[in-house]
């Protein structure tokens, strides 16, 4: 069994249990008490459209491939550092089993940062989309490697019906074809091989050229810093989802600013 299969099996059990604890009607009532979602897609599009870096800065305590990422894990301080460093949006892990995340992390990050926030989790059921909106998320991630096309369309529609943005994550050409048959403008290219966990930036470079011009490419995973960002910008990519590199920095705000202010220099 591969890592995604194991994650999906565990998530199915988790969602089934959650439905017994809190009914969908309860989530719908909570959603009514929330203000409208912040414009996640618009925040990314504004930066990417003028040629500057659209940085989605990620908050996560741990990962399956790297274990504990930051021992001094203070969500509010990290969210503020990301905002002050120039991030366009935040991505917050809410998966407990593999990333040691929780919904309260998302709620806190959104409250202190004032930025649009994406719920980063393994979405397999419309119930989770309602959960995301109830906890205050402005966008969700859909990993096409975990979903058949019907499921992906259903989850995208559920999010859009509540005014949320959707980041569609792909790893290869067949998934890209599926993504371009969906409505969301945001296509995330994950550079990490899900079997080996090795990251290769050529994945983004290769696939970005095949993405329709009306979409916005977000390069994800394995981005080591300013030099990698410049390399990917040279391939026409202006959107980046970065977590580990920033979280391991001694000064998160400065590390964020270095990425957010990266620019291509015009040839004389």
UniProtKB/Swiss-Prot annotation:
CDD domains with a match to the protein in the record: IGPS (cd00331)
Pfam families for the chain: IGPS (PF00218)
Reaction equation(s) it catalyzes: 1-(2-carboxyphenylamino)-1-deoxy-D-ribulose 5-phosphate + H(+) = (1S,2R)-1-C-(indol-3-yl)glycerol 3-phosphate + CO2 + H2O
Protein name: Indole-3-glycerol phosphate synthase 2
GO terms of biological process kind: L-tryptophan biosynthetic process
UniProt cross-references to Gene3D superfamilies, sorted A to Z: Aldolase class I (3.20.20.70)
Residues of the signal peptide: none
Metabolic or biological pathway: Amino-acid biosynthesis; L-tryptophan biosynthesis; L-tryptophan from chorismate: step 4/5
Gene: trpC2
Family classification: Belongs to the TrpC family.
Organism: Ralstonia nicotianae (strain ATCC BAA-1114 / GMI1000) (Ralstonia solanacearum)
Keywords: Amino-acid biosynthesis, Aromatic amino acid biosynthesis, Decarboxylase, Lyase, Plasmid, Tryptophan biosynthesis
Recorded GO MF terms: indole-3-glycerol-phosphate synthase activity; phosphoribosylanthranilate isomerase activity
Enzyme Commission number(s) of this protein: 4.1.1.48
Stored InterPro entries: Aldolase_TIM, Indole-3-glycerol_P_synth, Indole-3-glycerol_P_synth_dom, Indole-3-GlycerolPSynthase_CS, RibuloseP-bd_barrel
